[in-house]
């Protein structure tokens, strides 16, 4: 009897591990974790840092010892992504590998590990919804649904006009202001690139933010709750209302 139960359980486990990862666990990235050649993303396509960004490359490398160039892989990938309109083709990764003098696989490992690196095309305004527990409890799924429904896309897709795409990111570190989104603005490449947090958002507020971006406006980032100042409570402080008392010390002369 026990042997039959064990065999049945083993079969169930094997069936689970045969499924694609996306069916087993919630994916933390909207892209594949491997590369597929396409007409606009293959190793033999030329890619180089622009003349304007060459000086930025030198500046980034200057922060590290010459024998530790590989430490610059993340900021260089970020710069390449900004230049390329928000995504990293494999030829851009190869260019970074050449700059820091490592095998390309070392750069691929970093680019596929961090979900902030996009290996497929995104919109000029890439909207990322925080999906971690505090934001989820505060309604991040409703925020994401509002964005997807308003834009008429699925997660990871780009709107027909090329302006917007929506993805998910894990904890953005502003849990006290949940729920929140971030907007990566690639509309001007690496010149004028911004990455801003919009906190205390509602489904209506994120739609309003999208429409302001569509008009070329720059909506104010930070908390979207007018009753809050940064991460303070609504209506102002509830504690620490006066000057704090000084620390108490013993009279050492009395010892």
Swiss-Prot record:
Residues 214-255 are annotated as: Disordered. Its EC number is 7.1.1.2. It catalyses: a ubiquinone + NADH + 5 H(+)(in) = a ubiquinol + NAD(+) + 4 H(+)(out). GO terms for cellular component: cytosol; mitochondrial inner membrane; mitochondrion. Binds 1 [2Fe-2S] cluster. CDD domains: TRX_Fd_NuoE. It is found in: Mitochondrion inner membrane. PROSITE patterns: COMPLEX1_24K. Its main location: mitochondrion. GO terms for molecular function: 2 iron, 2 sulfur cluster binding; NADH dehydrogenase (ubiquinone) activity; zinc ion binding. InterPro entries: NuoE-like, NuoE_dom, NuoE_N, Thioredoxin-like_sf. Keywords: 2Fe-2S, Electron transport, Iron, Iron-sulfur, Membrane, Metal-binding, Mitochondrion, Mitochondrion inner membrane, NAD, Oxidoreductase, Respiratory chain, Transit peptide, Translocase, Transport, Ubiquinone. Signal peptide: none annotated. [2Fe-2S] cluster binds at residues 130, 135, 171, 175. Its cofactor is [2Fe-2S] cluster. The keyword Metal-binding applies. Residues 1-35 form a transit peptide. It is an enzyme of class 7 (translocase). It holds the Pfam family 2Fe-2S_thioredx. Complex I is composed of at least 49 different subunits. This is a component of the flavoprotein-sulfur (FP) fragment of the enzyme. Core subunit of the mitochondrial membrane respiratory chain NADH dehydrogenase (Complex I) that is believed to belong to the minimal assembly required for catalysis. Complex I functions in the transfer of electrons from NADH to the respiratory chain. The immediate electron acceptor for the enzyme is believed to be ubiquinone. Belongs to the complex I 24 kDa subunit family. PANTHER family: NADH DEHYDROGENASE [UBIQUINONE] FLAVOPROTEIN 2, MITOCHONDRIAL (PTHR10371:SF3), NADH DEHYDROGENASE UBIQUINONE FLAVOPROTEIN 2, MITOCHONDRIAL (PTHR10371). This is NADH dehydrogenase [ubiquinone] flavoprotein 2, mitochondrial.
